[in-house]
Amino acid sequence: MEVVTTPYPETAWRVPWIHVAFENAAAVASGVEAGLKSLGKRGIKVVAIGGDGGTVDIGLQALSGMVERNHNVLYICTDNEAYMNTGIQRSGATPYSAWTTTTPVGKVKRGEDLPKKDMPAIIAAHRAPYVATASVGYPLDFIKKVKKAASIEGPTYIHVHCPCGPGWRIDSSNTIEVAKLAVLTGMWNLYEIENGVFNLTFKPPKRRPVADYLKMQGRFRHLTEEEIAKIQRTIDEQWKRFGIE
C-alpha cells in the first residue's frame, strides 16, 4: 500500500492513515490502537495492510506481539509470494519450486526448495478470534470477510492471495484467471478460523489439476511432469489433512 499510494496525487485518503516501513505496520497499528484507548475512544477498528515479506518475514515479530497483546486491529496481508517491489526476491510466502531472482533455476537448484509458510495457521495458533484467507479472484468473499473481521473485537487477520504479473511471469490480463485457478486447483484455499473452529468457505465442485495453474506462469515453466506430479500429491495430501476430500 505504501508503494501504490505515495506518488502524487494519490496520497489523500478519506480516513486517517499513516505510511510506515514495510516491517512495522503491526507495531504502528498497535500503538495507534493503544493511543485511541488512552483517549477513551472505543469501538474503533484499526486496519493495517502489509505485503507477504513485511508480514511473514521481517514483520512477523511485530505481528505476533500485536495478536498476543489483543489489540483491536484488523491486519490484512496482501500476498504476491515474493518481495516484488524490490526485485522479485523470495519471501517466506514463496511457494515450493517457484523461480525468483534469489531462487534461480539451474542444474543444482530448481527454484524455491522450501514450502510456503502457513501464516494463517501461525496467527490461528496465537488464538486470534478470527483468521481468514481470501483471493482477489473472489472479491465478494473477500468483502464479506473484511466486514466480519472488522466487526469482531480483538486482533483479526485476513491473508489475501494476489497474483503479480511481472513476478509470476503472467500477462496482467490473466491476473484474475490465475487467482481463480489457484483456488480451483486447491493451491490456495478459502476458509475461516473463528474462535479455533475451521470452516471452508468455498469448495470447488471438482478440483482441477495443479498443472492448469502452474503452466500459466513463467515462474514455474522449468517444472517437469514428474515435478508437477509431486506438487499434485502434496496438494492432494493437504486436502485429505483438512478433511475436505
Segments and roles (model prediction):
Residues 1-75, 88, 92-98, 112:
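Cofactor-binding active-site loop characterized by glycine-rich and histidine/acidic residues
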Residues 41-42, 91-151:
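Conserved thiamine diphosphate
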Residues 63-66, 91-92, 147-151, 173-178:
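Short, solvent-exposed amphipathic alpha-helical segments in soluble enzyme
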Residues 77, 131-134, 157-161:
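Short, conserved beta-strand edge motifs with alternating hydrophobic and charged residues
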Residues 80-85, 165-167:
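Short gly/pro/ser/thr-enriched loop/turn and capping motifs at secondary-structure boundaries
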Residues 153-157, 188:
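Active-site lining segments that contact anionic ligands and/or coordinate catalytic metals
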Residues 162-245:
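Flexible, low-complexity linker and terminal segments
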